[in-house]
Amino acid sequence: MKKFLFVILVLGAFVLAACGGGATEAPATLAPVPADFAGKTNPLGADAATDGAKVFQVNCEPCHGPKGHGDGPAGTALDPKPKNLGVIQQMAGDDFLFWRISTGSPGTSMAPWQGILTEDQIWQVVAFVRTLQP
């Protein structure tokens, strides 16, 4: 009987392990950054993430959620769903993040923020996104 319970527990653990992790998966590759954005790095100082959190809360959190996981209340109706920024920031350079925030993402509901946010505000959001975890 003990052997049977052990086998059931082990099999259950494998099933749970196989089902986990889907929510934080990201695309295998990111789109290439256009030449006019490639190589850009954040010019702002260490306090930029604090200011970026405020900008993110007002402008990004409705879709991306408070932790950037793509689970904001406005994002639930979107197709495709907003990206998990904690995962994306691990894959992307500052240039990619600045580009996507500035110009949006075709085929998604990610709108361009260039002209709505200042360049410094976009860099502040980039700094804040760098603090997010998957």
State where each predicted segment sits:
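Positively charged n-region of N-terminal signal peptides that target proteins for export
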Residues: 1-4
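Sec-dependent N-terminal signal peptides
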Residues: 6-13
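C-terminal motif of bacterial Sec signal peptides marking the signal peptidase cleavage site
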Residues: 15-18
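Electrostatic cytochrome c docking/interface patches
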Residues: 24-55
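Sequence/structural segment immediately N-terminal to covalent heme-attachment motifs in c-type
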Residues: 46-69, 97-99
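Inter-heme linker and motif-flanking segments adjacent to c-type heme-binding CXXCH motifs
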Residues: 69, 131-134
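Short cysteine/histidine-rich zinc-coordinating motifs and their immediately flanking basic loops
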Residues: 73-77
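Extracytoplasmic electron-transfer domains, predominantly the class I c-type cytochrome c fold
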Residues: 79-132
